[in-house]
């Protein structure tokens, strides 16, 4: 019997069960635990496209028509990295959704072909062999300040944003809010032609229930409570009362100056109800110095924003100027300067690293253009994982590879924000039935620059060479929009997430959008326990004088990183 070495097999078909893959230039390795497309037990029938290869007529390609169930697209031999596992498989896509994960081919001549992966004349092939596939990232904290961020998001592997804003207005530069039905309608129309799913946040800073209900009918998918609009206990309670009735999520940026109360008063106003706490560490805003303690509460869904990820020797220096600009502060006013300095604490930023590694902070977003970078959500997440691997070693259950850590960290920008915002019925993971929002990565560039971004079954963004060249690969190879980013295609492959009340009130008939409006799921029963692999609730204490952080009684010492992977090895600037 002919034998192939593992090295030769990987070169031909991609790695298989038991092989390990390094993620970019980090210290992180993932190990394939199962190969549904080939490998041990299935070797010899791998679905591979190309000259002289398998997926040809009456060989790997069958006669099955689209009407008889052939998929529109098959991604062959991809390594799937998701919260539920790390496996290799062929992925079937039909009508813009994932329809099968298993083995593709022609059952007339092959064994083990998945019924949903029967390749036919109507099937397109994307080669995933040797590549990693993740679910499209969800940026759960986006300021809509300029439309150019949408391209940057796609270029970083993001396919969904939870966002607020109307452009470069002062309210939008500081707060993630699209206030009122008129602005919500215009922004839903403006965003209709981009190949990203959109969930807009209305203004929750009011004690007027009707002011919030009209925003839900106008297209808001949830609310933002921001200190710059006055996050008082009364506003918190009023907002959550409407959220409970509507089933939507509230996102909170608490009172840095402790003017209307301290963290204890905010928690009392929340009354144990589900709430998403933005930039839980506090440099992005929130009760000084101990907002980070909310990460230990079972009803609070905590997230970070990426400028503090991970803690490095440069983190503190860049934050002061960022904060002054974002919150319309005047450096010549001593009170404004004191306000800014109170938010930037190395001890809590350092503790944020550990809280991510133990799964106590569940999500990572960008805070785009408002102290964060939308194109770096994925990259900063894996840099944090690398720093924690170097400092803490393997997580429990890991020995030769970092599967437990990899699954925990990928969940922070995929399934966890999807669950938190009621989007998980449509997106957030590589699972059958969900939108085919998928990102393909070359392992050497994992988390840095995608090979291709598939949005709703179409390639919307990809690394592409000179368009006037004779082949697709000549330099300069740059991230570029593809046909899936064309306006009509983008609308057909993406959705606007809105509150159920908007659909019931006929919003689709009142606004000029071509994409489907999808109701968010009810999240009022979602707590930390529902955050996959990120459900820890440690006891967190912050000394009010020294800002020393204790996590389950232990002091976490500051050791800012001096060098990071996924950095200047990949970028000129």
From Swiss-Prot:
PTM-bearing positions, type N6-carboxylysine: 224
Entry keywords, A to Z: Cytoplasm, Hydrolase, Metal-binding, Nickel
Protein residues bound to Ni(2+) 2: 224, 253, 279
Organism field: Mycolicibacterium vanbaalenii (strain DSM 7251 / JCM 13017 / BCRC 16820 / KCTC 9966 / NRRL B-24157 / PYR-1)
Name used for this protein in its record: Urease subunit alpha
Cofactors named for this entry: Ni cation
Post-translational modification summary for this protein: Carboxylation allows a single lysine to coordinate two nickel ions.
InterPro entries: Amidohydro-rel, Metal-dep_hydrolase_composite, Metal_Hydrolase, Urease_alpha_N_dom, Urease_alpha_subunit, Urease_AS, Urease_asu, Urease_asu_c
């Amino acid at each position: 019997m002919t034998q192939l070495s593992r090295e030769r097999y990987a070169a031909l078909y991609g790695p298989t069960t038991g092989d390990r893959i390094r993620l970019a230039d980090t210290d992180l390795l993932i190990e394939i635990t199962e190969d549904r497309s080939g490998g041990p037990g299935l070797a010899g029938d791998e679905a591979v496209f190309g000259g002289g290869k398998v997926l040809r007529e009456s060989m790997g390609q069958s006669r099955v028509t689209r009407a008889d169930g052939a998929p529109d697209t098959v991604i062959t031999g991809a390594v799937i990295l998701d919260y539920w596992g790390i496996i290799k498989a062929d992925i079937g896509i039909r009508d813009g959704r994932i329809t099968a994960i298993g083995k593709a081919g022609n059952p007339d001549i092959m064994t083990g072909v998945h019924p949903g992966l029967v390749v036919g004349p109507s099937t397109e092939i994307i080669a995933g062999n040797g590549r990693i596939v993740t679910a499209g990232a969800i940026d759960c904290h986006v300021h809509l300040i300029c439309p150019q961020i949408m391209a940057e998001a796609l270029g970083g592997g993001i396919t969904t944003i939870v966002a607020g804003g109307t452009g470069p207005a002062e309210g939008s530069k500081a707060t993630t809010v699209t206030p009122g039905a008129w602005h919500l309608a215009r922004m839903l129309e403006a965003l209709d032609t981009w190949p990203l799913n959109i969930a807009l946040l209305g203004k929750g800073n009011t004690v007027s229930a009707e002011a919030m209900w009209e925003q839900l009918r106008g297209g808001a998918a949830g609310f933002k409570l921001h200190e710059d609009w006055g996050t008082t206990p009364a506003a918190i309670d009023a907002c959550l009362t409407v959220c409970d009735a509507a089933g939507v999520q509230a996102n909170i940026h608490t009172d840095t100056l402790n003017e209307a109360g301290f963290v204890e008063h905010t928690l009392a106003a929340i009354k144990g109800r589900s709430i998403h706490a933005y930039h839980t560490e506090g440099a992005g805003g929130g009760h000084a110095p101990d907002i980070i303690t909310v990460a230990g509460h079972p009803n609070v869904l905590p997230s970070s924003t990426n400028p503090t990820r991970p803690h490095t020797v440069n983190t503190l220096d860049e934050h002061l100027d960022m904060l002054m600009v974002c919150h319309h502060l005047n450096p010549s006013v001593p009170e404004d300067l004191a306000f800014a300095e109170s938010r930037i604490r190395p001890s809590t930023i350092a503790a944020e690293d550990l809280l991510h590694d133990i799964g106590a902070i569940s999500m990572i977003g960008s805070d785009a253009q408002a102290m964060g970078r939308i194109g770096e959500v994925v990259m900063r997440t894996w840099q944090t994982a690398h720093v924690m691997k170097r400092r803490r070693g393997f997580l429990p259950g890991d020995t030769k590879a970092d599967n437990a850590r990899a699954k925990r960290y990928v969940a922070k920008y995929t399934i966890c924000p999807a669950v938190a915002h009621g989007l998980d019925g449509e997106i957030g993971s590589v699972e059958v039935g969900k939108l085919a929002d998928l990102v393909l990565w070359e392992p050497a560039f994992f988390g840095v620059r995608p090979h291709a971004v598939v949005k709703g079954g179409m390639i919307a963004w990809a690394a592409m060479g000179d368009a006037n060249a004779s082949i697709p690969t000549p330099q300069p190879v740059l991230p570029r929009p593809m046909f899936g980013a064309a306006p009509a295609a983008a609308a057909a492959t993406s959705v606007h997430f809105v509150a159920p009340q908007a659909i019931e009130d006929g919003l689709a008939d009142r606004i000029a959008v071509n994409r489907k409006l999808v109701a968010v799921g009810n999240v009022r029963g979602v707590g930390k326990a529902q955050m996959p692999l990120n459900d820890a609730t440690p006891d967190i204490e912050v000394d009010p004088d020294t800002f020393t952080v204790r996590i389950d009684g232990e002091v976490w010492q500051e050791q800012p990183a001096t060098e990071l992977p996924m950095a200047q090895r990949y970028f000129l600037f």
